[in-house]
């Protein structure tokens, strides 16, 4: 092989010098702007575009790879031009050959002066530094310039310099390739012919450039020569072909931090200086300016879940004396206190007595797990003493849960020592029996009956317990003392605590909490035994209730064991209820109904008892009341009703809050009571599922016209019934949205003949739903048509009621959030899934970040989204078919 046929090359990684690039000339004409552009931007008239001679252009050059710059740009030096742009200048780029990646490209932008201190791009072009075979470019290249844009260094680039979009560019590209082949020795060199050929090539290129609408920038890349031999630069990376291990799975590496969990000395020093006792006298008379006052008002208005920043805590502490006149600010102040510092805690407790008394509903926050100081918790109990029995009953379920955050030793120490007493000779409390806690049946604590009595004492005549006026009561003592004064409170306190005592999950997971509830029940039993005759009657009636429920559970188990179909089980149920010798349920001494103790019952009517069509077959029972009437209930065995009990309690509370604002939305908060983790009572409301209404009557309006016709009312329906329907729809739409009630279909929406619509079956709450893509609220086409359609007056009234209800409930959001915060450790299925997110889920539904006006617009969007939810309609049809095939 001859010397001329050899290919000489050098690796790019071995050439440790900077890349150089020569900027040659710029060919082509710049297109002038239109007169309209000059009128809109008069500065154009003074730019280089309108100079008589060639304007003073300059070129910047920058290397890119993968869309990122590898170095700073460099530019040509100043040069004055007369007839053509010709820099003829070598630029030394701040990048060396070994540092160039395979996909490196150089971006060239031509700039023109545009006013003082500014420039505009004439055009840009980009070219890769390595060819498709990995050879570094050499020699001269004519690059197409894209007008009025900067060179694009991304990959792929939007300003390619080497392109063949037209026939003329194809011709120039073909000639450039032939020139390159001649330079590399792939053609026979004939001097006289070469000179003629190159001259002709230059003429063709000049002609093509002139006829083209684009400008062309000529650049030249360095050629490497050694010993009169030309070398090509081949891209090569040392050790680039070696395989490198790739981790298919990551591994966490734990790096020990010696300062982790250690005290931050700077923060501690700042905290001590900010809370110094020396600043107390000066803080006493401190008043905030307007800006600070607004900031304090914002902090006070925060929801109870909001964590205060260190700056906000310091601000509240600084103006603590000023805030003592604001009852809403007390909880925020107590959050600022570091209770581990004795002096700071002492200051806070001294100020607690001087603070303006907080509202009863706000004091519930102080009973949550976040407040462990016993004085603070007893202050909350002292505020609860101001609540009447009706309000206390609304919070009782949560207050029983709040016992989990009390001092268990204090509750245990409240038990009286074991001793025989003449008053208890007929029935000793379990604590005197010597039975160990592990062998305790919680229902036996209070089911040792006294001699029977004719009727329970009126709540107003119950004698006050001696410690009832004690301002230092803990929560347990307070609840027991109030229950001893009111038979209704005693009824619900007993059943709420009984359920906690019988909770097997708590017994296994947290034995101390289980033991605490047993001690609460013992103390309750002792308090009832210590009272006068009327108080001891309460204990006797609670024991009778427990016996009655136990017999009913025994009966339901016997019915469930019965083989055969539902009809046969119904017959067995009625037969057992009628057998007074075995069950003694149809004729009993007068006792309060556990579900609603104001109702006194004499037994169950056997002939009317029936079982529902469902897997667990709950029983519908009719109780004989004291006045000879009937009270229908549903008794469920094998089902945990605590979640339904919570939701109905919150709905009942919301109904009371709305009525307080003179807004009666005709809600139906039927009563639910869990008497165990496996059984309980539900009030039965005579009603028809909406699905059945649509099947039998065709529409909701037809149903109303059948049972409440009126010639003068809207659509031939009684105006009162239509008003009730519209209001109840609005109330439940807003409430079920806030509580995140899921699994809504027309079988668990019920309708009464008086127009009340209400929801049942709250197995999915807080955003959980077995169906995909549920709408924000259950509001389908059939329900809207029941109001007369989206254009009707009733539908507009429905929307108005939704807005009003939502705004009112937002104002009571703190109370509702406090109640849910006390339930986070309750064994309620949908809360136990994510207890730390429970309160946040409810808070998010209130949208407290919005103003009232914004909240109304937000509710509008929710209603519109729910009405037009197409997927929800499809799911409803699927559910309808599924129910059909089950039947």
UniProtKB/Swiss-Prot annotation:
GO MF, one example: ATP binding
Regions of compositional bias (Pro residues) in chain numbering: 449-459
Protein name per the record: Phosphatidylinositol 3-kinase catalytic subunit type 3
Family affiliation: Belongs to the PI3/PI4-kinase family.
Positions of region (Catalytic loop): 740-748
Localization per Swiss-Prot or TrEMBL: Midbody; Late endosome; Cytoplasmic vesicle, Autophagosome
UniProt domain PIK helical: residue ranges: 283-520
Biased composition (Polar residues): 156-170
Cofactor (UniProt): Mn(2+)
GO biological process: autophagosome assembly; autophagosome maturation; autophagy; cell division; cellular response to glucose starvation; cellular response to starvation; early endosome to late endosome transport; endosome organization
EC main group: transferase
Keywords: ATP-binding, Autophagy, Cell cycle, Cell division, Cytoplasmic vesicle, Endosome, Kinase, Lipid metabolism, Manganese, Nucleotide-binding, Phosphoprotein, Transferase, Ubl conjugation
Lineage, uppermost ranks: Eukaryota, Metazoa, Chordata, Craniata, Vertebrata
